[in-house]
């Protein structure tokens, strides 16, 4: 298996769960978790099954979009209240993860800015924003790798600190 073929966090094709690479098992075992409940995603973030600030942010953004898609609210006020409840809960999963809070705030801002839309369209906007957050991080990671490659020479070693990138 090529490491470049692995995604740390993906939304399933039918958009009913997150597919998360369980990083606690690496490098010996590659296992993808399929998590649909907010509590299970919270636990995956809390227990470092998802590692690296950017990946945690992407995971939280998709989790919020998933949870919002299940809201039965019929008006924007109730929908935003449901979203805020899920956001506040997810924020407790890793109190030091900056990207977690940044992504959750960005998702809530997207909902507030689009609150005039019909609820089904608002839900779609949240999925689109979560996807945008993921794609931005993938592009940043690729750019870092491309630029960094030009700085390395045969025999150089690399020491990493923490995990980064989706």
Regions found by a protein language model. Give the residues of each.
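N-terminal active-site beta-alpha-beta segment that forms phosphate/nucleotide-binding
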Residues: 49-166
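Positively charged, low-complexity intrinsically disordered leader regions
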Residues: 1-39, 43-46
């Amino acid at each position: 298996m090529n490491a470049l073929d692995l995604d740390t966090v993906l939304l399933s094709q039918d958009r009913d769960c997150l597919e998360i690479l369980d990083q606690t098992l690496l490098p010996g075992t590659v296992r993808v978790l399929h998590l649909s409940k907010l509590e299970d995603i919270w636990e995956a973030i809390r227990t470092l099954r998802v590692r690296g600030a950017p990946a945690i942010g992407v995971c939280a953004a998709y989790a919020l979009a998933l949870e919002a898609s299940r809201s039965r609210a019929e008006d924007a006020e109730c929908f935003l209240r449901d979203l805020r409840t899920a956001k506040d809960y997810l924020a407790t999963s890793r109190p030091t993860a900056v990207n977690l809070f940044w992504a959750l705030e960005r998702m809530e801002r997207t909902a507030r800015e689009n609150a005039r839309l019909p609820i089904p369209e608002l839900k779609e906007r949240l999925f689109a924003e979560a996807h945008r957050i993921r794609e931005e991080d993938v592009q940043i990671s690729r750019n870092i790798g491309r630029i960094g490659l030009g700085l390395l020479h045969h025999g150089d070693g690399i020491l990493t600190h923490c995990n980064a990138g989706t």
